[in-house]
């Protein structure tokens, strides 16, 4: 396995170079802006390419060390894409609404996750002894909890890296990550503040094709990390399994010799 490849052409075709209207910009983004066309800022893809590669390496390295990546994208056009990419790469996601304290108050969130698990078990067992109304209420409670927490149900604890689409919309999530020292990989459009991001990726954060490309690449980087981790484990396991094989076989000829 290796880090996923991408080309400047792919970035262009996905519209990653299109920023927002010039009057909506954040001046801190000036170093990442190539110019303007028809009052739309054009993002400098010659900077996006190395920064995207750096972000992908960080994702792969984090997962290779056994770390967890949390995908965050709650805007309408990102929601399904984020969930699919996280599930495909055995990572975690928040794609409905960021609940305040999702990271900084993990203990409370854990209690809600336990409740979700309990509801899953109860309803899987057909909720015997419950009336239709009681079952309906449990179904609704489960649906609500699953929508909010289903993507982090199996995360176990706070993540080791966060990947964010739209830093303005997910400002609370980023703030919580910063408080806990969790590094953040994020797409920074022309109206974003790059200072808060550890691994910024300059690019459009609204177009569905752009979001699809980012998520696909991040997912592939995570899968690369999983392959590297398993490869490393395979070497260790192989060595430990092979070591006792020869001594175990040695006695065989000596026990047969007297019989011959």
UniProtKB/Swiss-Prot annotation:
Domain of life: Bacteria
InterPro entries, alphabetized: Ribosomal_uS2 (IPR001865), Ribosomal_uS2_bac/mit/plastid (IPR005706), Ribosomal_uS2_CS (IPR018130), Ribosomal_uS2_flav_dom_sf (IPR023591)
One family name in Pfam for this protein: Ribosomal_S2
PROSITE patterns noted in UniProt: RIBOSOMAL_S2_2
Any one cellular-component term (Gene Ontology): cytosolic small ribosomal subunit
Keyword Ribonucleoprotein carried by entry: yes
Matches recorded under Gene3D superfamilies: Glucose-6-phosphate isomerase like protein, domain 1 (3.40.50.10490), Helix hairpin bin (1.10.287.610)
GO terms under biological process: translation
Family per record: Belongs to the universal ribosomal protein uS2 family.
Name the UniProt record assigns to this protein: Small ribosomal subunit protein uS2
Lineage: Bacteria, Pseudomonadati, Pseudomonadota, Alphaproteobacteria, Hyphomicrobiales
């Amino acid at each position: 396995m290796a880090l996923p490849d991408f080309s400047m052409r792919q970035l262009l075709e996905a519209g990653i170079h299109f920023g927002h209207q010039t009057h909506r910009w954040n001046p801190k983004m000036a170093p990442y802006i190539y110019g303007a066309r028809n009052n739309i800022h054009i993002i400098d893809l010659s900077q996006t390419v190395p920064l995207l590669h750096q972000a992908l390496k960080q994702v792969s390295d984090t997962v290779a060390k056994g770390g967890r990546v949390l995908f965050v994208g709650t805007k309408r056009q990102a929601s399904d894409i984020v969930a699919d990419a996280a599930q495909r790469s055995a990572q975690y996601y928040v794609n409905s609404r960021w609940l305040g304290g999702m990271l900084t108050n993990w203990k409370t969130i854990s209690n809600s996750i336990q409740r979700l698990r309990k509801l899953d078990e109860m309803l899987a067992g057909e909720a015997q002894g419950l009336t239709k109304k009681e079952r309906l209420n449990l179904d609704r409670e489960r649906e609500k909890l699953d929508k909010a927490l289903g993507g982090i149900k199996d995360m176990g604890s706070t993540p080791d890296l966060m990947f964010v689409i739209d830093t303005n919309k997910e400002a609370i999530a980023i703030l919580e990550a910063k408080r806990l020292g969790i590094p953040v990989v994020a797409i920074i459009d022309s109206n974003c503040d790059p200072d808060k991001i550890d691994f910024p990726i300059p690019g459009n954060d609204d177009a569905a094709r752009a979001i699809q490309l980012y998520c696909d690449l991040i997912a592939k980087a995570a899968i690369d990390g999983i392959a590297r981790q398993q490869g490393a484990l395979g070497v260790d396991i192989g060595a430990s399994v092979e070591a006792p094989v020869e001594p175990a076989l040695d006695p065989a000829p000596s026990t047969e010799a007297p019989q011959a």
